[in-house]
Amino acid sequence: DLVKVIKEAIVNSPYDFMITQGLRSAKYQNELYQQGRTKRGLKVTNADGYIKKSNHQMKVDGFGYAIDFVILNGKALDWDTESKYEAVAKHLLEVGHKLGIDLEWGGNWRFKDYPHIQIAGADKIAFKK
């Protein structure tokens, strides 16, 4: 479902973007979790991949339910322009709605995750064991 949304949305998005993350292993999720904790860098997630899982991780149906994206500014990656992330996220949410696929944007969360989009209700779907 998420692939359908991205394929349609990327055609007429207000800004060019590309997917940077999709399905993640628990090990990789934990590496991201360690940023800003045991490794240098800013905290980028509250999900450690083992106790608290991310919707990027595989669910029982074999799919991840989240993606991260980055705004493209020519050939450069623009990680910092909130308004561009908001515009692309709004567009993704609208395309999802048109296709009957409800999405959530990480920019609406208390812990802001502007490059993150996931299928609404993904937290209720069991993870693969």
Which residue stretches match the model-derived regions?
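Glycine-rich loop at the start of a catalytic domain that most often binds anionic cofactors/ligands
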Residues: 31-39
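Short hydrophobic/aromatic-enriched beta-strand-loop microsegments
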Residues: 40-45
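Sec/Tat-exported extracytoplasmic proteins
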Residues: 13, 36, 96-99
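Short, well-structured alpha-helical interface segments that form or flank functional binding sites
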Residues: 4, 27, 87
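Catalytic cores and adjacent binding grooves of peptidoglycan-active enzymes
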Residues: 47-48, 52-129
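Active-site acidic/histidine clusters and adjacent loop/turn architecture
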Residues: 1-18, 84
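Residue-level signal for well-ordered alpha-helical scaffold segments within enzymatic catalytic domains
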Residues: 8, 31, 91-94
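Acidic helix-start/capping segments at beta-turn-to-alpha-helix junctions
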Residues: 19-32, 111
